[in-house]
């Protein structure tokens, strides 16, 4: 269904409620440049990593899994038997995920705050456009938990909206992104109203800050495997 949520001001902060869940897939595709390409790219790196590190039944966590799109991409690229666990604190999102993946016997979903979850040892984790919604003071705590639960040679994928450390470049990047959204059919008002709703809810870091954060919790190998203006996909490997 087409995202028309921001035709008028919501007069409240953005949250992942039933109204958002109803149009979320359209919102993602029209708001994140190369969204599905990044999912496929992330699935590729996890699939290749699993080939290099054979486990009996690899466990993969998708934190902030929303409507389950990444699990679809993973199942298209990974042939071996895997266990997929999606965690999200929005029940409306998980209902959508369960509907879409009802035929996927290897996927299960849990409605929980992933900051409070005790993870099992896993071959891979994904945080796709999620860390930006975690309070800055809690990001290092979460990433350290992930690092400690990641198997040796395991991989973490982090997709993020980012900012530039240069004020002028940041302004130009934002303007280009708004032009992209207009080309996707969003009006000036819709863009402004959504920006207003996301104020202090989505807090982006720079690319350098995100990489430094991952390195601070123990990752020695972090690569930006994709970047478009103010969006990036990072792959971090535990060695």
From Swiss-Prot:
Keywords: S-adenosyl-L-methionine, Transferase. S-adenosyl-L-methionine binds at residues 35, 64-66, 88-89, 195. It catalyses: prephenate + S-adenosyl-L-methionine = carboxy-S-adenosyl-L-methionine + 3-phenylpyruvate + H2O. InterPro entries: CmoA, Methyltransf_25, SAM-dependent_MTases_sf. It is an enzyme of class 2 (transferase). Gene3D superfamilies: Vaccinia Virus protein VP39. SUPFAM superfamilies: S-adenosyl-L-methionine-dependent methyltransferases. Homodimer. HAMAP family: Cx_SAM_synthase (MF_01589). Belongs to the class I-like SAM-binding methyltransferase superfamily. Cx-SAM synthase family. PANTHER family: CARBOXY-S-ADENOSYL-L-METHIONINE SYNTHASE, TRANS-ACONITATE 2-METHYLTRANSFERASE-RELATED. This is Carboxy-S-adenosyl-L-methionine synthase. It comes from Helicobacter pylori (strain G27). The lineage of its organism: Bacteria, Pseudomonadati, Campylobacterota, Epsilonproteobacteria, Campylobacterales.
């Amino acid at each position: 269904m087409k995202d028309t949520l921001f035709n008028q001001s919501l007069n409240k902060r953005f949250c992942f409620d039933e109204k958002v869940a109803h149009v979320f897939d359209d919102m993602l595709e029209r708001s994140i440049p190369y969204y599905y390409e990044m999912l496929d790219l992330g699935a590729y790196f996890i699939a290749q990593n699993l080939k290099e590190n054979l486990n009996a039944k690899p466990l993969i966590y998708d934190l902030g899994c929303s409507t389950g799109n990444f699990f679809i991409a993973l199942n298209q690229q990974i042939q071996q038997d895997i266990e997929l666990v999606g965690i999200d604190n929005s029940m409306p999102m998980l209902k959508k995920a369960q509907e879409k993946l009802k035929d996927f016997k290897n996927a299960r979903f849990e409605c929980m705050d992933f900051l409070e979850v005790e993870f099992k040892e896993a071959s891979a984790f994904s945080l796709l456009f999620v860390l930006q919604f975690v309070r800055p003071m809690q990001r290092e705590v979460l990433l350290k938990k992930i690092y400690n639960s990641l198997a040796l040679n395991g991989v973490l994928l982090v997709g993020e909206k980012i900012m530039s450390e240069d004020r002028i470049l940041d302004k130009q990047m934002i303007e280009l992104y708004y032009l992209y959204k207009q080309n996707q059919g969003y009006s000036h008002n819709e863009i402004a109203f959504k920006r207003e709703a996301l104020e202090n809810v989505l807090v982006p870091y720079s690319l350098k800050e995100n990489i430094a954060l991952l390195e601070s919790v123990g990752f020695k190998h972090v690569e930006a495997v994709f970047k478009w203006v103010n969006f990036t996909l990072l792959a971090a490997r535990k060695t």
